[in-house]
């Protein structure tokens, strides 16, 4: 039996040394020290020994089991350390390598134009006013000199929710609400950026949803010359310092007189090209002097106060500024289109 124990010890130590991972090592542990292992069988056979031999053989079995256990623990520590070192090597970071570039987003071209226009007018002393996109018919039409049944309402089909509630068709209601809050006391000097909605068929130049920026100035002694000077400054900041503007008579129910505003073509310098369709001028916005009826409905004395208003579409400004030929590009989230403005 002593020879058998020494043989088991030698076999176990050899297999422990040969184990190359923790699973193989655990298999050796179970094979030699488990309940069905050979050392347990030796212990069960000690009943056939004489009383004098039992203590000697028991001590020998314990020595063999202790030797195998110590070898197992030492090998386990070695394998665990090797596994940690292997994992660390796989996860090692060379801090001298250049970093991986992080792809960053960029402002949408419409956001760029809107913020540029806002900054321009804020620098001229204007404040930004906002209002609801779901608007009352009164502020969208009636407070702007468009009573129910007025033929000018046919100029823009609207998204009505109820007879008195609709999606605003322009940002002019913000002007009406702001003047109302001033309770007939000037000055008022605001721009109103925001989304508007009209029942247009989407194509290269039309959309059922788009953005507008409208401006309003109300105070004593406001003249058409103030409007022209303001818009000339706007055109030169947006399209170049050598730009000029011209007014063409037009009609809007909420201004009188009303004008369409053209800017001299920034592509050809006014000589005529495909951008300006050979005219040398490009239409960019509508404007006019605030109609006395609009002032009176907002609580202002039209004999004391005058004002001017203007409205533009950032989409059109952006299309002209960046040479974009289809308004739908702004709303399709095509990364090939949007990524071009990283360089702008």
Swiss-Prot record:
This is Phenylalanine--tRNA ligase alpha subunit. It is found in: Cytoplasm. Keywords: Aminoacyl-tRNA synthetase, ATP-binding, Cytoplasm, Ligase, Magnesium, Metal-binding, Nucleotide-binding, Protein biosynthesis. Tetramer of two alpha and two beta subunits. Belongs to the class-II aminoacyl-tRNA synthetase family. Phe-tRNA synthetase alpha subunit type 1 subfamily. Its cofactor is Mg(2+). Its EC number is 6.1.1.20. It is an enzyme of class 6 (ligase). Mg(2+) binds at residue 256. GO terms for molecular function: ATP binding; catalytic activity, acting on a protein; magnesium ion binding; phenylalanine-tRNA ligase activity; transferase activity; tRNA binding. It catalyses: tRNA(Phe) + L-phenylalanine + ATP = L-phenylalanyl-tRNA(Phe) + AMP + diphosphate + H(+). It holds the Pfam family tRNA-synt_2d. One of its GO terms (cellular component) is cytoplasm.
């Amino acid at each position: 039996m002593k020879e058998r124990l020494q043989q088991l010890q030698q076999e176990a130590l050899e297999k422990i040394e040969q184990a190359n991972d923790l699973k193989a090592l655990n298999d050796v542990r179970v094979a030699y020290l488990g309940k069905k292992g050979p050392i347990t069988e030796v212990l069960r056979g000690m009943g056939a020994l004489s009383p004098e031999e039992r203590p000697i053989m028991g001590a020998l079995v314990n020595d063999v089991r202790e030797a195998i256990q110590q070898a197992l623990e030492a090998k386990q520590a070695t394998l665990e350390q090797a596994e940690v070192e292997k994992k660390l090597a796989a996860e090692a970071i060379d801090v001298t390598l250049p970093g991986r570039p992080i792809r960053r987003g960029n402002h949408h071209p419409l956001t760029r134009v809107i913020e540029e226009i806002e900054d321009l007018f804020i620098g001229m002393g204007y404040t930004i006013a906002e209002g609801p996109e779901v608007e009352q018919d009164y502020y969208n039409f009636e407070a702007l000199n468009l009573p129910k049944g007025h033929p000018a309402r046919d100029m823009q089909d609207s998204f009505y929710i109820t007879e008195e509630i609709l999606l605003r068709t322009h940002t002019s209601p913000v002007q009406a609400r702001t003047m109302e809050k001033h309770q007939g006391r000037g000055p008022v000097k605001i721009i109103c950026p925001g989304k508007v909605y009209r029942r247009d068929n989407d194509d290269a130049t039309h959309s059922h949803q788009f953005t507008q920026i409208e401006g309003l100035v109300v105070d004593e002694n406001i003249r058409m010359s103030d409007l022209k000077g303001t818009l000339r400054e706007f055109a030169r900041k947006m399209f170049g310092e050598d730009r000029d503007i011209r007014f063409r008579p037009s009609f809007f129910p909420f201004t009188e007189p009303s004008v369409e505003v053209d800017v001299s073509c920034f592509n050809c310098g006014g000589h005529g090209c495909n951008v300006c369709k050979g005219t040398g001028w490009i239409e960019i916005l509508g404007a006019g002097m605030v109609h006395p009826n609009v002032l009176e409905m907002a609580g202002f004395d039209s004999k004391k106060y005058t004002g001017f208003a203007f409205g533009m579409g950032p989409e059109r400004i952006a299309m002209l500024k960046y040479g974009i030929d289809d308004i739908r590009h702004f709303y399709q989230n095509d990364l090939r289109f949007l990524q071009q403005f990283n360089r702008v």
